[in-house]
């Protein structure tokens, strides 16, 4: 548009074909000289509106993870609550239309099928289900990640066949590693990749049990999964092992005394468009593992790097002892480990990228003493922090949780402080691992500017400023028209941020989705997201399915 206006201003009014051609040539010359191109002006962004919702009134324990089955036009959600553990449920999207919900916070216009107990199909003398962690669907094949009880024992994947009505028939179970936390079918449906977190025992302080993290690959041929998985662990990266020199120094090994294989904890899986590689987040380790699926092995470990909160673009709100409106500030010698949770891959102009939701996590629930401390309780190096007394006040950094094992000098004083998570999303070139974009403080700014004062003061938001802010939890990418959009779930803000990522180096914010008025009602804490392309949607337009961990609800947004 700029170039069109410029030509109108500097060229005479069009009176002939010759003048018209001259104007077009002049426009082309200017565009070439200044690097403009037709793609500089993005088409109008699509808008998402809430058209469907399922809430059974039970709250937590339902709908944490969601997947879509095209043939039956159904969503499948995990169910794991006290009276219905280790289960899943079908929610029908048949008959869904494009009308916005009239009372979105209270509405529940979707019908559900019976809850299916996975435990009843997999429990035997050698295995007791300890909960369902994730699910995914390829064609008519449903896969459920099931942790064992205790969680440190090897888990399994339960497979079901779905019919056109969404009825599920149990097929088989396949053993995998300890605590299968995330799983994903390859785009071609030929493999299922499972991230086995291998988390510390809940009673680690007394029993010392720390299983290895691992990645399982289950082949699928003609719609039937193999009886056995290929499971890869990280023992080759242990000290003195054959690949120990390949372990980047920037990959965080957090627990003193742990081997590399024990400390690396796979969390979430995404797979390249050509089904050749899996990208698996190692959240506690601030890294991503690249897995070759054609000749199964771990190719390399990619450290995600460090975020400098001394830069203005990375300012943050760091205290839960202040009242809104929150002021974002930058602090010298304060850094963040990205520690990605959710991950998604996408391709632009032949290049593969992955996008991560940089939530952060620690092991304090299991590891005693813990690995974090509040800044007010630390001895700060006077040269690095000449204003230490002021910084350690509760209304500044005093309440902020940081890693207590990083950034100390030889006297045990802290020269640098490292927080958990990036409070952001970032995009990486999948081939090189290089970060090509990072959202800085934008997610925090969006959250705090879009919530009113009463919501900002809620413990769900204010109470997390000293930890991980809005907590980017999950991310999916989908195509709407000719554009690619990322949907980033913010757990503590109970919101989803939509970005146009068609240009991976310069994403553009599009829309903020939130269906809660007081952080006590409506849809709370998005955990799992699933994108439904228009070609498979019951409305003919793309859909976003969102599972909410705290409210136990499922939301369906139409994007058009």
Task: Describe the role of every protein-language-model region.
Residues 39-560:
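Beta-sheet-rich non-transmembrane sensory/scaffold domains
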Residues 5, 19, 35-37, 44, ...:
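Intrinsically disordered, low-complexity serine/threonine-rich segments
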Residues 1-20:
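N-terminal secretory signal peptides that target proteins for export/translocation
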Residues 5, 10-11, 34-38, 103, ...:
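Short, flexible coil/linker elements and helix-boundary hinge sites characteristic
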Residues 15-37:
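Gram-negative bacterial Sec-dependent N-terminal signal peptides
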Residues 9, 23, 28-29, 189, ...:
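Intrinsically disordered, low-complexity segments enriched in polar/charged small residues
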């Amino acid at each position: 548009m700029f170039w069109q206006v410029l030509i109108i201003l500097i060229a005479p009014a069009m009176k002939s074909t010759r003048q018209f051609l001259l104007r077009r040539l002049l426009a082309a010359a200017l565009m070439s000289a200044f690097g403009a191109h037709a793609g500089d002006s993005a088409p109008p962004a699509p808008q998402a509106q809430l058209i469907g919702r399922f809430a059974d009134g039970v709250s937590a324990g339902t709908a944490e993870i969601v997947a879509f089955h095209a043939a039956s036009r159904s969503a499948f959600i995990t169910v794991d609550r006290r009276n219905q553990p280790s289960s899943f449920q079908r929610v029908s999207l048949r008959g869904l239309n494009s009308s916005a919900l009239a009372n979105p916070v209270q509405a529940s216009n979707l019908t559900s099928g019976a809850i299916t107990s996975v435990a009843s199909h997999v429990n035997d003398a050698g295995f007791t289900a300890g909960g369902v962690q994730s699910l995914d669907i390829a064609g008519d094949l449903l896969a459920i990640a099931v942790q064992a009880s205790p969680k440190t024992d090897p888990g399994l994947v339960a497979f079901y066949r779905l019919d056109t009505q969404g009825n599920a028939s149990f097929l088989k179970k396949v053993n995998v590693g300890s605590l299968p936390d995330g799983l994903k079918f390859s785009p071609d449906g030929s493999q299922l990749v499972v991230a086995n977190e291998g988390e510390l025992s809940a009673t680690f302080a007394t029993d010392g049990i720390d299983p290895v993290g691992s990645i399982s690959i289950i082949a699928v041929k003609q719609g039937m999964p193999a009886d056995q998985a290929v499971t890869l662990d990280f023992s080759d990266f242990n000290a003195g092992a054959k690949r120990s020199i390949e372990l980047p120094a920037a990959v965080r090994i957090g627990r003193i005394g742990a081997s590399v294989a024990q400390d690396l904890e796979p969390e979430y899986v995404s797979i390249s468009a050509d089904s050749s590689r899996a990208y698996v987040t190692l959240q506690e380790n601030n890294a991503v593992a690249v897995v070759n699926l054609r000749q199964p092995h771990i190719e390399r470990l990619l450290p995600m790097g460090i975020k400098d909160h001394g830069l203005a673009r990375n300012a943050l709100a760091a205290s839960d002892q202040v009242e809104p409106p929150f002021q974002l500030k930058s602090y010298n010698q304060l850094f963040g480990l990205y520690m990605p949770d959710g991950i998604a891959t996408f391709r632009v102009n032949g290049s593969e990228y992955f996008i991560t939701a940089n939530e952060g996590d620690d092991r304090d629930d299991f590891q005693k003493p813990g690995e974090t401390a509040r800044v007010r309780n630390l001895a700060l190096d006077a040269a690095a922090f000449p204003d230490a007394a002021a910084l350690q006040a509760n209304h500044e950094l005093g309440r902020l949780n940081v890693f207590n094992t990083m950034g100390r000098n030889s006297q045990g004083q802290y020269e640098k402080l490292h927080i958990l998570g990036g409070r952001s999303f970032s995009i990486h070139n999948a081939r090189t691992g290089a970060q090509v974009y990072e959202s800085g403080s934008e997610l925090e700014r969006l959250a705090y500017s879009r919530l009113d004062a009463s919501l900002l003061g809620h413990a769900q938001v204010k109470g997390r400023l000293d930890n991980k802010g809005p907590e980017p939890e999950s991310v999916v990418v989908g195509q709407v028209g000719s554009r690619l959009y990322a949907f980033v779930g913010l757990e503590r803000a109970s919101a989803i941020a939509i970005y146009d990522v068609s240009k991976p180096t310069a994403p553009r914010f599009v829309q903020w989705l939130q269906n809660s008025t007081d952080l006590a009602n409506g849809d709370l804490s998005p955990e799992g997201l699933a994108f439904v392309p228009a070609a498979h949607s019951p409305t003919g337009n793309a859909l976003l399915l969102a599972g909410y961990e705290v409210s136990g609800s499922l939301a369906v947004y139409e994007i058009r």
